[in-house]
Amino acid sequence: MRYFYTDKHHLHDPRTEIEASGLNEPREKPARLDEIAHALATGPTFERVELTPHGLGPIKNVHDPAMVDFLSEAWARFQVQVRDSREVVPDVFAMSSLRLGMDGGRAPLPVDAQLGWYCFETTTPLVAGTFEAATAAVDVALTATDLVFDSLSAAPVA
């Protein structure tokens, strides 16, 4: 059986997340995936598939390109424009329901305000490597998808 994996998941490794009004250790963390990957790598019937880089095009096809661009630089901008912080989360959130009957609004310019525009919860803080880890996860999903579609197109038609 084939499996798809990247070590880049280590790049998203926050120490805390805000959930239920408290600072908590994240439930999803690199060590959890490391254990799964180790079990697969040492299993006699598993084969790791090398990933195909897909770039940002597929991501921007399904997400607001401005949000993708923002997330690519948000952590670094926050360090310069607001303060040095290992984890970055929004302080406030844009509430589109408050704008009912008005135009759709536009993203604010300050990075700390943009966090609340593009992010909508506090259990996934941004860290220095979050964007790279997220784009690598897309390569995992799309490489697997490519393989499935390739095998379907190669299958004989009955």
Locate the predicted segments by residue.
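HDAC/HDAC-like amidohydrolase catalytic core signature
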Residues: 1-158
